[in-house]
Regions:
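Short, Lys/Arg-rich, polar N-terminal cytosolic tail immediately upstream
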Residues: 1-8
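Flexible interhelical linker loops that connect adjacent transmembrane helices
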Residues: 2, 272-302
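Membrane-water interface segments at the C-terminal ends of transmembrane alpha-helices
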Residues: 8-41, 56-171, 199-219, 224, ...
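Transmembrane helix boundary and interhelical loop/hinge segments in multi-pass membrane proteins
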Residues: 45-47, 166-179, 188, 216, ...
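Juxtamembrane helix-boundary/capping and inter-helix hinge elements in multi-pass membrane proteins
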Residues: 57, 92-95, 171-176, 186-188, ...
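Glycine-rich helix-loop "coupling/hinge" segments at transmembrane-helix boundaries
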Residues: 121, 219-245, 327-332
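Glycine/proline-centered hinge or cleavage motifs at structural transition points of membrane proteins
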Residues: 184-186, 198
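Helix-loop-helix hairpin linking two adjacent transmembrane segments in secondary transporters
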Residues: 237-261
Length: 358
């Protein structure tokens, strides 16, 4: 009996092509990263010295502990902001809801270091808000640099991930589930924690992992405002480009630790979601209701204040782009001079950016 020859149709070729690209641009770099972490500088021989050096000196392993501390705190703060915001926007009528959702999405549309730079302009040593409060009221603002500043910038930048994912999950919750809980005597708070939260917990954990990975791997924000608080990405960069004593193999070892930590958390998240996952189709989706009294005021203040803080970096960037400059300093007055310079000197960069996006 003759063996049947494999048939290569269009979709088989596409699948092979996708797998080849996946292997070339993802699997191969990761394997190279791990292999380089076990090589000795100069000889290329196998060694554990890179990891021994990292865990043997507080100067290095402290950056890993700092990264974990910052990332965990940012993830928790993002959950504490994003989940309540998603609940409020899904269950209650908030004035300007469509505009608020657009602004939340816009707040995600710039690199993290842009937000850090904007907050430096506001709350830095010579920031607008810092100088105003100091000169007018004699109030000394806490420093934007270090752990606190990074926690602020990362949280305001990354909580929209939580909000968007949890909002999507809440749209699949059938109102009959909430009505059943109310008929059994559950008050509003108990209904949230015993009915609503268990339904969206797998989604919240998945979005929290995205926040964790974004914060863990970010370099720009710690480089700008991480003064006195070393984290692993900046240590890796300094080690890789350092002109005095830097080692690409040692940098690879540190980077591989980040990959391992993220991979372990991803596997734990997948295990939990698979264990707790379920499918729900909302025959009657939740219809927002209008809150009354102080409750309504508090929810509006919370939502508006949060959105304002989220878009402040973008407003600051627009404001500073319109200010006049001489050499590299701001002077009184406003103009479109900066935009003119963009088309004279940076047009190719804009074209390249658009080209890469497309």
């Amino acid at each position: 009996m003759s063996k049947r020859k494999p048939q290569f149709d269009f979709w088989t070729i596409v699948t092979i092509g996708i797998l080849a690209v996946f292997a070339l641009f993802l699997i191969y770099p990761l394997i190279s990263l791990f292999v380089d972490g076990f090589l000795e500088e100069g000889t290329g021989a196998f060694t554990m010295a890179n990891f021994t050096k990292f865990f043997g000196k507080k100067f290095y392993y402290r950056s890993l502990l700092n990264s974990l501390k910052l990332t965990v705190c940012v993830t928790i703060c993002s959950l504490l902001i994003g989940v309540p915001l998603a609940y409020i926007m899904s269950f209650f009528k908030i004035r300007g809801k469509s505009i608020i959702e657009i602004l939340i999405i816009i707040s995600m549309m710039s690199p993290n270091f842009i937000g850090a730079y904007s907050w430096i302009l506001l709350l830095g040593r010579s920031g607008v808000v810092t100088q105003f409060l100091s000169n007018t009221f004699g109030i000394k603002m806490p420093s934007i640099y270090g752990f606190g500043g990074m926690l602020l910038v990362f949280t305001l930048k990354l909580y929209p991930f939580i909000y968007m994912y949890v909002s999507g999950a809440l749209k699949k919750v059938d109102v009959a589930v909430c009505e059943a809980a109310e008929s059994l005597g559950c008050n509003a708070i108990r209904k949230v924690f015993t009915v609503v939260m268990p339904l969206v917990t797998p989604t919240a954990i998945a979005s929290a992992l995205l926040v964790f990975m974004n914060c863990m791997a970010d370099f720009g924000t710690p480089a700008l405002i991480g003064e006195g608080y070393d984290v692993l990405p900046t240590k890796i960069y300094i080690e890789f480009v350092g002109e005095s004593g830097g080692s690409a193999y040692f940098a690879s070892a540190m980077a591989s630790l980040m990959v391992v930590i993220t991979a372990v958390l991803f596997l734990l998240q997948k295990w939990y979601v698979n264990k707790k996952s379920f499918t729900m189709s909302a025959m009657r989706p939740i219809q927002p209701t209008r809150a009354k009294g102080a409750k309504n005021v508090i929810m509006h203040v919370f939502t508006y204040l949060l959105v304002i803080l989220s878009v402040v970096p973008h407003l600051v960037i627009i404001w500073t782009s319109l200010r006049k400059t001489e050499v590299q300093y701001f002077v009184d007055g406003y103009s479109f001079e900066s935009y003119t310079k963009i088309f004279d000197t940076a047009l190719s960069s804009i074209q390249n950016t658009v080209q890469y996006v497309l």
